[in-house]
Amino acid sequence: MLRGALKLAIVAYAAVILGFVWLTKDLTFATLARDPLFATYSIAVVLYVLGRFVVALFYRSVPDRGFRPTVSIIIPAFNEEDGIIGTIASCLAVDYPASRLQVIAVDDGSSDRTWERIQEAKQRWPQLYAVTLGRNYGKRGAMAEGIRRATGEILVFVDSDSYLDADAVVNLVQPFADRRVGAVVGHADVRNSGVNWLTKMQQVRYFSAFRVIKGTESLLSGTVTCASGCCAAYRRRVVLPLLEGWEFQTFLGRPATFGDDRALTNRILTGHRVVYQASARAETVAPERLRVFFRQQLRWKKSWLRESMQVLRYFWRKNPAAAVFTYASIAFPFMAPWVVLHAVAGRLLGGEPGGLWFYVVGTYAMALLYSLFYAFKRQDGLWFHGMTFVALYMSVLVFQTYWGILTMRDTRWGTRASTVEHARIDQGLVVALPPDVRRPPQAMGARFGRPDDYQHGRREGESAAADHAPVLER
């Protein structure tokens, strides 16, 4: 009954849009004819959005065919004392063969009681592999340490404020039965979606970003451009050769300290497929305050800008349709601020008001399309909150592209140093890492720009007892 009503609503929506165009055709076409650049942008955006929806309608998750590789779940954590035990518990409670599952919690030198909480979890669940880096190296350093400790064929990353569904891992690994797949991203919902209007809006946006955008990218020859850290899996043998370049990535002469997931995905995409698995679900905590939300969006925008430069170099060799969608998704954020300013300036200077009106109504129409799609898939009453995104987009977010460029060298969030090889200290016993993941410090420093305290890493062949790296394992 409800689904029928939603289908009717979507049909009615299409009728309203067509009616709007017909009734205002003189104004609309006159406005577009006088401004060919605005017309080109408007038509391109409509085709882009509708094209994604059409492709996404054909998306289906890979079914469970009994594929059960060994899995290592890695949880990098920094100052998450309130939620880390819940995250660990959700990872240990997944419906997956215990003999084929490893869970690793890495404390990135937290200044609160995160390490104590991890130790409490270790006492409750002895199978947990617990590591602390002693001081803050940044998320990428914690992820890299987890990779070095992992033994599974598949590496699953879970953010320390995220929670896996019971069947998430089983579903997440199924696409890896295809040897061409190097990474898989699951679906994330907002755990705190009921807190306020901002979290409700983000729930609708998250759903659209995963189900529509990643769903489309996945169908187009496995070209998902970001395996989000709240629930993502990688083939270990594919990651290890890329580990050095990713961990010590620099940009504009500085260490890359955010966008870790997008950067790793970018490297995987050069030789393998990255797909979306909607049936592998997780929940993550979203910002509840506008200030935090805007900072998060700016970080994401900066990493998107950095990695898009790499995408431009090779994506044309991927699926042609995927390349068109991807290059368009890069071009539009650069064009949008000028379109907004052009429309507003034209109205303020006494020009034809149709441009501004057409842009605002068109943007709301696209937002309504996403919201109705959410309503069709999720009957939780939150669909209308997707419309509030338009106001934030046109007033703030649309201009973040250029602000991100101007502040690109500001890497204060997640600043880190790193070592290549840490010693494992357990009750006074120091044990070297497995030799297959060891890297000579000289080579890494020379190629990728070694941080000063990288010198503390142990050189190939040195005595482990002489190493004083700040890594504890319990």
Describe every region a protein language model picked out:
Residues R65-F315, A446, R450-P451, R458-A464, ...:
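Non-transmembrane catalytic domains and loops of membrane-associated enzymes and transporters
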Residues G19-L57, V62-G66, T326-T411:
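Membrane-embedded multi-pass helical conduit in multi-pass membrane proteins
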Residues A5, D436, P440-P451:
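Short helical patches
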Residues M1-I10:
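N-terminal membrane topogenic signal
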Residues S72-G86, V396-L406, H422-P441:
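Cytosolic juxtamembrane regulatory segments of multi-pass membrane proteins
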Residues S228, Y234-R236, R412-V437:
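Short linear elements at protein peripheries
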Residues G4, R291-H342:
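Active-site-adjacent helix/loop segment of glycosyltransferases
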